[in-house]
Amino acid sequence: MDFPQRVNGWALYAHPCFQETYDALVAEVEALKGKDPENYQRKAATKLLAVVHKVIEEHITVNPSSPAFRHGKSLGSGKNKDWSRVKFGAGRYRLFFRYSEKEKVIILGWMNDENTLRTYGKKTDAYTVFSKMLKRGHPPADWESLTQETEESH
């Protein structure tokens, strides 16, 4: 999947924080395909990549404002409330995104990997890691900076 692109009427962008994780997953799947072209589709990374595409194309871009994507207070309150997240991969993976209904834009902010699976109370928990990223400003918390940083990377 290349970014930016238009999906279900939404302009879909990938922030560098998401793009880095996504590209690593794509590279892993391509390496698996090179090693074992007949069986790579059975591997966990290949299945995960397929689920990521499905989540983006059939869930996020269909209704980004769905109540199912609200994170409650998992990222704290205040300025992080505008981030949404989708759960997948047996509840261990999270893909965080922001959207603007007015602009019809969705920005994929970050997706955790096998090193940051959802594990309550751990330093490597997806919410803990993403909260720290937001505190450091990468990705930025405000829409204007997020949009600018995302556009500069494409």
Curated annotation (Swiss-Prot):
An example Gene Ontology molecular-function term: RNA nuclease activity
Any one GO CC term of the record? toxin-antitoxin complex
Short name of any one Pfam family annotated for the protein: Toxin_YhaV
Which enzyme class, named as a word?
hydrolase
Query: What follows loss of this gene?
Result: Deletion of the prlF-yhaV operon has no effect on virulence in mouse infection; the disrupted strain is as virulent as wild-type.
E.C. designation(s): 3.1.-.-
What are the entry keywords? Endonuclease, Hydrolase, Nuclease, Repressor, Toxin-antitoxin system, Transcription, Transcription regulation
Q: What InterPro entries has UniProt attached to this entry?
A: Toxin_endonuclease_YhaV
* Role played: Toxic component of a type II toxin-antitoxin (TA) system. Has RNase activity in vitro. Acts as a transcription factor. The YhaV/PrlF complex binds the prlF-yhaV operon, probably negatively regulating its expression.
Q: Whom does it interact with, and what assembly results? A: Homohexamer; forms a complex with PrlF (SohA) with stoichiometry PrlF(2)-YhaV(4), possibly as a YhaV(2)-PrlF(2)-YhaV(2) complex like the MazFE complex. May dimerize in solution.
State what protein this is by name: Toxin YhaV
Specify the species: Escherichia coli O6:H1 (strain CFT073 / ATCC 700928 / UPEC)
Give the taxonomic lineage as stored in the record: Bacteria, Pseudomonadati, Pseudomonadota, Gammaproteobacteria, Enterobacterales
